Regions:
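Conserved hydrolase catalytic core segment
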Residues: 1-34
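Internal catalytic or translocation cores that form aromatic/hydrophobic pockets or channels
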Residues: 21-70
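Catalytic active-site module of serine/aspartate enzymes centered on a nucleophile-bearing elbow/loop
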Residues: 150-183
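Conserved loop-alpha-helix segment in the C-terminal half of the alpha/beta-hydrolase fold
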Residues: 118-161
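Active-site loop signature of alpha/beta-hydrolase-fold enzymes
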Residues: 26, 134, 164
Length: 183
């Protein structure tokens, strides 16, 4: 959502509608953290994360469920089969670059995002989770300040969902997106 929202601001003429799912949650960062962040990033380049692997799709599904207790075992297994692939040795690994887990060397500066978001002209849907711990940590006032940067926006809350609302309530998320994009 962060990348899409910034693109919608700097290339406003190319975005007809923008939907953001439980998004814009990065906290503003203290500039004094920059030396430690850059040092950590450089150190990680010398020792990048490796890909985790699992005994089976079922064990990957168990890991996914530990991070999201709302998932049924069937839905977690379906996600595991999409997220994973079997290696020649039979183990399952994620179809993701493990370097994605590395921290960005640049600190997040909310004021820069606000300036870009004020350039968004597309109607914007904020599709938020009812029980997002990240949204709660950001605070209602800060989240409203961020939403208000978008000229034409509306907010819809998906009940009984956490940050991964598209996993928790895929039917409700799909219905909201279809209604918004078909308008």
């Amino acid at each position: 959502g962060q990348a899409a929202s910034l693109f919608a601001g700097v290339r406003a003429e190319r975005v007809a509608r923008l939907a953001l799912l439980d998004s814009l949650l990065l906290p503003d960062m203290d500039p004094d953290l920059a030396p430690k962040r850059l040092t950590g990033w450089l150190d990680a380049l010398n020792d990048p994360p490796t890909q985790r692997s699992y005994d089976s799709y079922e064990s990957l599904a168990e890991r996914i469920t530990r991070r999201n207790a709302r998932l049924t075992p069937e839905r977690a297994l379906a996600i595991a089969r999409v997220w994973g692939q079997q290696r020649p040795d039979g183990r399952i690994e994620l179809l993701a670059d493990p370097r994605h887990r590395m921290r960005n060397p640049i600190l997040y500066r909310a004021a820069e995002s606000y300036a870009v978001w004020r350039q968004v002209t597309a109607p914007t849907l904020f599709l938020d989770a009812s029980d997002s711990p990240l949204m709660a940590a950001a605070g209602d006032e800060e989240m409203q300040r961020r939403r208000d940067c978008f000229r034409d926006h509306r907010r819809q809350i998906v009940s009984d969902s956490g940050h991964m609302l598209h996993h928790d309530q895929p039917e409700a998320v799909a219905a909201a997106l279809l209604q918004f994009f078909d308008a």
